[in-house]
């Protein structure tokens, strides 16, 4: 039996995509509760599909496996890798500088989507499918197999066979998605340079599983984990290269080697993580790093609190050397930046007034967008992706510190 779910695709559903995640969850729960279904394969892809599926699996608690549709092939523009999402932010800046025209902008954007599949960067789609695998809810290696590859068809077939066995074994999500499994997911998400949206989604999945899990766990468990995957936006490569270098299993083996994740946990295979990862994996050291040659020593999320917000998340893996040198180089206070706050009342106001000379935005300004949270804007929208005014971009200032009460794109390198 096949059945659809509520459709979700971030850019097509903005600003309501987070609400659509919950609608997708509800539609899945109604079908899984309302029909005599013994087990389910949850097909996922773009950003919100995976958390919606895992939330439903947690609520209904019948045998379930997550089967990702897989990322697109690597894209190229003028001989260089073109990552979905990341190249859009780059193209927007080039257009603002006047270095490309609109037709060239569209060519750049189109180059990042060379095939079927979800985003080929380590955006929210690849991050959440990797998290599903880290939780033990996908067959090993499933998350990053490119959509057009024959291996994607093979793992789909294996997933179909396995769900039948899981029904007979009564292997349910509650036996797999334990507290320790969520701890593993945080560590893996940090090591791969995962999307900041993982924090929101994983907390929601845990809540539906009845597990106490909050934002402070992200810093406690993940902040000191090194960046092991050299993929955009935190690195250089894309998902096709990550797959060829062993994918999530390669990262988990390195984490096991350094005793950073729990190994004796049940997975959808009916085996433990250790048993799943017995085979030797051929790794490209340029793509998947070891602890000794990691891209960054600390790649996890920082949880911040202040007198004007209760909690905030910073994705440290995308903070560039240029940004650190410019804003975070005070030897007395290396993680403190002092600057003028420029406040916008929502993304519409930001786009309308960003280039206004009256605001006097300079390189020592902090861009703030407010009114975009769960209450003030539909479902905490993904609209906190801000770039400097055009005149600063033309001077070579490509980033400013930003702050907002909504969410950022998983492909954004905006600090």
Language-model-detected regions and their locations in the chain:
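Catalytic or ion-coupling anion/metal-binding cores of large enzyme and transporter domains
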Residues: 2, 11-17, 50, 56-62, ...
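N-terminal small/polar loop signature for handling phosphorylated ligands or for N-terminal nucleophile
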Residues: 2-35
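A short, small-residue-rich loop immediately preceding and capping a beta-strand
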Residues: 33-53, 64-68
């Amino acid at each position: 039996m096949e059945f659809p779910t509520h459709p979700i695709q971030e850019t097509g559903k903005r600003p309501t995509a987070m609400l659509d995640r919950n609608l997708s969850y509800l539609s899945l729960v109604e079908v899984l509760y309302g029909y005599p279904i013994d087990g389910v394969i949850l097909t996922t892809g773009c950003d919100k599909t995976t958390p919606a599926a895992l939330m439903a699996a947690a609520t209904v608690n019948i045998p379930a496996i997550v089967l990702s549709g897989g990322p697109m092939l690597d894209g190229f523009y003028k001989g260089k890798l073109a990552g979905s999402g990341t190249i859009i932010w780059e193209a927007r800046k080039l257009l603002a500088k006047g270095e490309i025209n609109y037709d060239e902008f569209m060519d750049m954007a189109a180059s990042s989507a060379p095939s079927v599949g979800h985003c080929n960067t380590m955006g929210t789609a690849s991050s959440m499918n990797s998290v599903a695998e880290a939780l033990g809810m996908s067959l090993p290696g499933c998350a990053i197999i490119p959509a057009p590859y024959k291996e994607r068809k093979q793992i789909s077939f294996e997933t179909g066979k396995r769900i039948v066995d899981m029904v007979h074994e009564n292997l349910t999500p509650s036996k797999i998605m334990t507290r320790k499994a969520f701890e593993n997911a945080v560590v893996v998400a940090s090591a791969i340079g995962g999307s900041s949206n993982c924090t929101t989604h994983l907390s929601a999945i845990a809540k539906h599983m009845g597990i106490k899990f909050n934002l402070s766990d992200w810093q406690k468990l993940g902040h000191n984990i090194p960046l092991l995957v050299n993929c955009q936006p935190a690195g250089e490569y894309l998902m096709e290269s990550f797959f060829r270098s062993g994918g999530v299993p390669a990262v988990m083996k390195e984490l096991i080697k350094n005793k950073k994740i729990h190994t004796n946990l049940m997975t959808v295979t009916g085996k433990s993580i250790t048993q799943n990862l017995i085979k030797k994996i051929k790794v490209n050291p340029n793509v998947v790093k070891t602890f000794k040659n990691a891209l960054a020593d600390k790649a996890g999320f920082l949880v911040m609190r202040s007198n004007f917000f209760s909690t905030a998340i910073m994705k440290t893996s995308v903070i560039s050397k240029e940004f650190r040198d410019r804003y975070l180089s005070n030897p007395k206070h290396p993680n403190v930046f002092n600057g003028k706050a420029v406040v916008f009342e929502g993304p519409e106001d930001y786009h309308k007034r960003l280039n206004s000379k009256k605001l006097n935005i300079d390189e020592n300004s902090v861009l703030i967008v407010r009114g975009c949270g769960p209450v003030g804007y539909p479902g905490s929208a993904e609209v906190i992706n801000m770039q400097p005014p055009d005149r600063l971009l033309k001077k070579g200032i490509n980033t400013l510190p930003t702050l907002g009460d909504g969410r950022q794109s998983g492909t954004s390198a905006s600090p």
